[in-house]
Amino acid sequence: EFGEKFAKNIAKVLRGYTKFNGRRKPENLFPHVLSIVNNNEADRVLAEYEEITELAEEIYEKLPKERKDAYYQLVLYPTKASYLMYKLHICTAKNRLYAKQGRVSANRYAKMVNEAFVQDYIMSEYYNKTMAKGKWDGMMNQAHLGQTGWRSAEVNMMPKLELVSPKGGGGKMFVALPDSDEVVDSGTYELDAFSNIGDETRSIVIGNQGDSPVDYTVTADQSFIKIRIRRFNNTDAFVTETAKGSTYEDNIVDVCIDWSKIPAGKKSVDGNLTINGTGKTVVIKVKADVYDVSRLPKNTFVDTNGVISIEAEHYSENVSLGGGEWKVIDDYGRSLSSMKVFPTELAVKKPGVDSPYLEYHFTANETGKMTLYTYCAPTNNLSADLGMKYSVAIDDEKPQIVETFANTLPVGSGEVWDSGVMMNCRILATQHELNKKEIHTLRIYMVDAGFTLQKLVIDCNESIKESFLGPQESYFTK
């Protein structure tokens, strides 16, 4: 339709926006859905969407005039309109939190929400009135912003926003730490430990609650700590001593580790970052742990912080039994892909007897009770007399059979179905016990063939941070 020259990139755009919208339909987006605090989730998702939107726009500009209307309808509009929905809701969430914190930058995000709202209107009007000379006038009339129930709103409605009046008396520095919705201007705090096996950067915000710019310095007391300043319009290079800045709104301090500066044989090192500005001082402890994974088998996931997150397709063993075989479903699920047994009409199987299974290996730094969260597709039972079950076992324990969607769901339990539809996922928790520190084996058995596995998250010490997509995948040996 649009020529071989553009086929590969158009396919990338279409795969991207259908995958991203599969996580959560745009009409079911709200400001609270994605976390703007934990796991850098909202910013990561928006950056992914921005990348494919920019690609879609680049293609549009290069297409011949006679192809632009069809491309706008089939590719550019659904991609960019979805991106604008994500941007509007994420910026709304930031505006509300930052206003609560007294941050001057709340006003910038209010402006960005207004801009996204106007852009959405302009795109819909172009679709209705200009594209193909108005052939599809009215197609994009349905309101999609301000939804409060199952019926669509009559008109698009702007979300409620907050504006901040800066405090008088000059600049007033604050610091916002990763994975926290609090801001501080004094005291000593600690970042999550860095590990040499992950490409890790932690980001700290230095911001302002006052009516004039904040001048600040960030000083590292150890040469292995690298820091850089990131602003809305440019990013400095990493340095290993002192970084300086001035901001009326927010600057971001990225922190990472220069592993070449850690002495050989050291398993753990510590240092401090000191942030000074407007007469305030905040000290942040930095810890770096060195892991030796050279002797671990291939595809072993490594525990570095009490949480092990595993994408379904990164198994160690895929064992076919009873006529069933686990296969990858690309681009389906919260993040990477999913695994499902085929053929779908396969009869119920018994774990440990004739059930095909996936096996995963992981290390754990602690023993005792732990929780496994299994992310699966919100598939309903495939027949009236069956549920939708899978089975799970860790190490030598007896397999637990887990019901994801009962065939006899009680009247009044519609929220189970509703939640699955809204989230395009069900998350099931099972309890297990790790008796020793070693490489552990986790098996997921098919019971009902409709079960589709998206990801696994092991929580060893109740340290999972709340987010929509769940923790990013942990390091595993290659």
Predicted regions and their residues:
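Catalytic domains of carbohydrate-active enzymes that cleave complex glycans
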Residues: E1-Q209, I308-I329, M339-V348, P356-A364, ...
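Extracytoplasmic
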Residues: I197-K478
